[in-house]
A protein has these predicted regions:
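Histidine-/acidic-rich catalytic cores in large beta-rich domains
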Residues: 1-214
């Protein structure tokens, strides 16, 4: 792996606190992975796996996205065991053409699919994937997929969330742009910003109404 005795490997974890700030549960990548088994550890030691999103699956276990690995892990919220790994070199079978290339904003969408913003680093084109996970078959299949226009390719950061059955709100952070697209990837609305937004989420008007002054 390289390096010396004084080197530090920075990893990621999950910390659960109660409302009083007391630790309830803790998990670390070092509990389940040996950094010295990574042949490229010297290259990534300052940010070994780069976790960038944490959310709940429908069964209340954790979904954790690792940018540097190009994977999403499902982690048992009680034992800390890694239940499966989705993505490049993962434990769930899927066609090579359906594998995302680095991801952000992993979550379960309203239809129950695992949805993520695909940075598309390998293809130099970003997009959105929604997968159906078959835990019994240890496989993943694409529910739907959108390719965003090549001119707003976004290799870092970003997010994607459905607004309804036909529209998806996508944030291309490094391009300083948020777009509303249909399931064909066609842009129907655009918001340009002076700063790079890390993530953009849709808030229904009903939730905003109490805070809007007439």
């Amino acid at each position: 792996a390289g390096g010396g005795k004084a080197d530090t490997v920075n990893g990621d974890g999950i910390l659960v606190l109660d409302r009083n700030g007391k630790k309830v549960w803790q998990w670390s990548v070092f509990d389940v992975c040996d950094p010295f088994a990574d042949a490229e550890l010297e290259k990534h030691k300052k940010d070994w796996m780069h976790a960038n999103s944490l959310s709940f699956d429908v069964d209340s276990n954790y979904l954790l996205s690792f940018y540097n690995l190009g994977q999403v892990w499902k982690i048992d919220a009680h034992s800390g065991r890694v239940l499966w790994k989705l993505g490049k070199g993962g434990t769930l079978r899927m066609p090579a053409a359906d594998v995302f290339s680095q991801s952000h904003a992993v979550h379960i969408d309203p239809a129950g699919s695992l949805m993520l913003f695909d940075n598309g680093v390998g293809r130099k084109q970003s997009g959105v994937f929604a997968y159906r996970i078959d835990t019994a078959a240890r496989s993943a299949a694409v529910d739907w997929h959108i390719n965003l226009p090549a001119e707003i390719y976004n290799d870092r950061m970003g997010s994607a969330y459905t607004i309804d059955d036909s529209l998806v709100l996508c944030c291309c952070s490094k391009r300083h742009i948020t777009v509303l697209v249909n399931k064909k990837g066609e842009i129907v609305w655009t918001l340009d910003t002076a700063i790079p937004p890390y993530r953009v989420e849709f808030i229904p008007a009903a939730l905003l109404k109490p805070y809007i002054l007439d």
